[in-house]
Amino acid sequence: MCQLSLIGLAFKLYDPDHLIGEREDIGITVALVPTDLPGVEIGRRHLPALQAFQNGPTRGRDVFIPVDNVIGGVAQVGQGWKMLMSALAAGRGISLPSLSAAGAAVAAHTTGAYARIREQFHQPIGRFPAIQERLGRMAATVYLLDAARRLTCAGIDHGHKPAVITAVMKEQATERLRVVVNDAMDVHGGKGVQDGPHNYLGTSYRSVPIGITVEGANIVTRSLIQFGQGAIRSHPYLLKEMTALEDPDRARRALVTLCATWAQKSRSNASSPRARSGSSSAVISLSR
């Protein structure tokens, strides 16, 4: 069995003795850790959902990691979050959405064929309205996933690293794949739950939770990245204010400038005809 030789490790870095600077709480940092370092232990591989997906425990106790092993050296300590988001953008924007689009297409193709040849009450089950509803939803989702995949990949291909868009794409693609596979299983009925070499849906059905969990679990991705980071990036001044706070020398002046600009923008929005019309409508609605 192939043994790992290098581990990419993200960790929260503290420097209480000020060995590399004045700050103690430096932040998330990424380092490359050789597996032959004393204290590193590589466990046996797991078998997630009975699939050939490489996964297993890695443990470390009293491991000494040289500062040269930090990606980017001392100059890049505390920059791990940006590194992780940039690295995850490829997996979230390319591999998992493409896998979801392909899996949904296969499920829709096989289910449509099955609904045509499987008969009940002397007619194909594809003529039943309930089956047609599921087939229609599956077909629409397949086209939707393929269009979204192409758009996201085009942005990445042009050099962009859209962290928020790729997070949205990963979450939406894997969740919609789950819906398509569930619809396919419903149409196949008992055929879909009988394990064997002729069951072409069972493996996909078991694999769906893996895509939902890896590269950032969807339940976390949706709340932390889509709403949290998305709101910060879309706001015209909030990200600049947060960045200014990281530099004590220019924080006060930058914050005053940004807050003044923010206040001016708010007054401009409040005095616009659309805002006044909305306020009047709200007052009339409340008075009623």
Residues covered by each model-derived region:
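Flexible glycine/proline-rich, aromatic-decorated loop/lid segments
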Residues: V63, G73-K82, G190-Y205
